Regions:
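Peripheral (non-transmembrane) domains and long loops of multi-pass membrane proteins
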Residues: 166-172
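A short acidic, glycine-rich active-site loop
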Residues: 97-105, 172-184
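Canonical Radical SAM [4Fe-4S] cluster-binding loop centered on the CxxxCxxC motif
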Residues: 1-11
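Short, flexible active-site loop motifs that bind/organize anionic cofactors or intermediates
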Residues: 6-7, 37, 97, 173
Length: 202
């Protein structure tokens, strides 16, 4: 296996725009376009021209993000986004790397800015649940309360990235997959903190 094998395709803004508009009938019926990960906020300047072109057509835009990106990036895309899907990382602690403190502060700033300027009905919070955190739900719940998050979607972890890790020559850490019963217990614990939740199966 060539670890440097190119597994993506480069597109110009106009090429992407033309591809997206193939589904114009869906958008006319009330559908929209979602930008997701990687982390789209880290490509804010690159996707900005595309966001602008799409909004000129009156198409609804959503973004799925961890909010771990510079506040400047958030500010760039904010005027064009109608719905926000926030992939919370509270179950891991915080993303730790050489920019740990910067990323942590950026998350705080972005979340605060978003909550202050966007009606809550346009924000969806999600969190992946693995067996390893089932005894730490109280800690997670307190953090959710701290950030005024009263409704969250719980997603059981999966191993869909396993083959990609193998292709890249990296070690894949398999977290424990929670059962539906364990997810139900998790939801009950969150409810004790007045946090409503719903779970999805993969």
């Amino acid at each position: 296996m060539n670890f440097f094998e190119k597994t993506f395709h480069d597109y110009t803004i106009d090429e992407l725009y033309d591809i997206l508009l193939r589904d114009i009938s869906i958008y006319d019926a009330g559908g929209g376009i979602t930008f997701s990960g990687g982390e789209p906020l880290l490509q804010a300047t690159q996707i900005l021209p595309l966001l602008q072109k799409i909004k000129q057509k009156g198409i609804s835009l959503a973004i799925e993000t961890t909010l771990y990106a510079p506040i400047e990036n958030y500010t760039i895309v904010y005027p064009y986004i109608d719905f926000w899907i926030i992939d919370l990382k509270f179950q891991y602690g915080f993303i730790r790397n050489k920019d740990y403190n910067i990323n942590r502060m950026s998350f705080y700033m972005n979340l605060k800015a978003l909550q202050q300027s966007t009606d809550q009905q346009y924000i969806i919070y999600r969190m992946v649940v693995m067996s390893e955190i089932l005894d730490k739900i109280d800690i997670v719940a307190k953090k959710l309360c701290k950030y005024n998050i009263a409704l969250i979607e719980l997603l059981p972890c999966h191993s869909l990235a396993k083959n990609k890790y193998k292709e890249l020559g990296k070690t894949f850490h398999q977290f424990g997959l929670p059962t539906m019963e364990e997810l139900s217990i998790c939801k009950e614990q969150l409810l004790q903190y007045s946090i409503l939740s719903k779970s999805h199966s993969l």
